[in-house]
Amino acid sequence: MTIDRHALGFGYGEKAVYASDPWTSRGRLYDEGSSPTRSDFQRDRDRIVHTTAFRRLKHKTQVFIAQDGDHYRTRLTHTIEVAQVARALARALKLDEDLAEGVALVHDFGHTPFGHTGEDALHEMLQPYGGFDHNAQSLRIVTKLERRYAEFDGLNLTWETLEGLVKHNGPLLTPDGKDTRGPVPQPILDYCEIHDLEIATYASLEAQVAAIADDIAYNTHDIDDGLRSGYLTFDMLEEIPFLSELMAEVRARYPHLEASRFTHEIMRRQITRMVEDVISVAQQALSEVKPGSVADIRAAGRVIAAFSPEMAETDKRIKQMLFKRIYRHPDIMRIRTGAAQIVTDLFRAYMDNPKEMQSHYWVDHIAGLAVAAKARHVGDYLAGMTDTYAISAHRRLFDQTPDLR
């Protein structure tokens, strides 16, 4: 792995020709005047941070249920960590840091309470009505469900931020219109009818670094939380050569380090090596593609910000370890079963009696809706809940609520 340090950005100087430019943005769905003090991408980031959806991430599960302890990561702390890695990558590659950060900050808005378990349960309930997808839900939140402004629903974010939100994991369609990862969620197709996000092309490089930053952050920090919880041990980490090498490096330099500091020294090295790997791969890809603009990035037909084959294999092995040792651990599976029951019970209760939602907006706007629209309305309400609110709502409606501890 080699990095051209002379080509790195350090937060000053001109951006690369292939970086997104807020001054030539494709604009917003609803035209607004420009700000004399902030770029359009800075305004997007600021709007995202001030949303209700962002604050709710504090009490939404990353891996461990939010009530498990104050030291475990939540969706909010994970999101902040992703944004930090995304900014670091964007700075090194001379991209627009504000756009990369904005995409990172908004990427998890659509997650339900109880993480992927809640999403799976809600998807099952909504299956007859088009299902549920957290990425599509993120788009619904920032284009419709956040109600803050007098002249429009949503946040009226720039085209570039919305593109990054929808396409940060790659195109949703092939150039000839075929699905790349299963059917495109209907909310995304509906929005593209009025504001075409060009879902058959790759996203900007800013969006790509936000996506790879997500991988770096959650792999590293799930290991940290796994060690803290006891579901992982240092011996388990030794089974992965990359992690074993990092541990040997730390032991050689600090022979008698206490466990908590030892863990941190491993994690910081893991993040650094992964970030440097992505920078090296991106620099090589850019030298091959030779993009003269962000349009060339979108038309490149390949991911620019990615892991090397060796690091991709390490990433795969880490995911397999986390899946086996944590995500499928009997304790976690028991909690997941209870969490799924809470989401399922609440959905059925609200469909049977919408007044139980106990919110004037949600109750008033459900009257007269057809069954499919009613189900989506209930799904929107449920998806916005935090873990703690969903548990308390279930306790209010049912005699027995699953113990998620």
Curated annotation (Swiss-Prot):
Residues covered by the HD domain: 75-219
UniProt xrefs under Gene3D superfamilies: Hypothetical protein af1432 (1.10.3210.10)
Statement: the UniProt record of this protein carries the keyword Protein transport: no
GO molecular function: triphosphoric monoester hydrolase activity
Cross-referenced SUPFAM superfamilies: HD-domain/PDEase-like (SSF109604)
Domain of life: Bacteria
Keyword vocabulary terms for this entry: Hydrolase
Family in the record: Belongs to the dGTPase family. Type 2 subfamily.
HAMAP family linked to this entry: dGTPase_type2
Protein's recorded name: Deoxyguanosinetriphosphate triphosphohydrolase-like protein
Organism encoding this protein: Rhizobium rhizogenes (strain K84 / ATCC BAA-868)
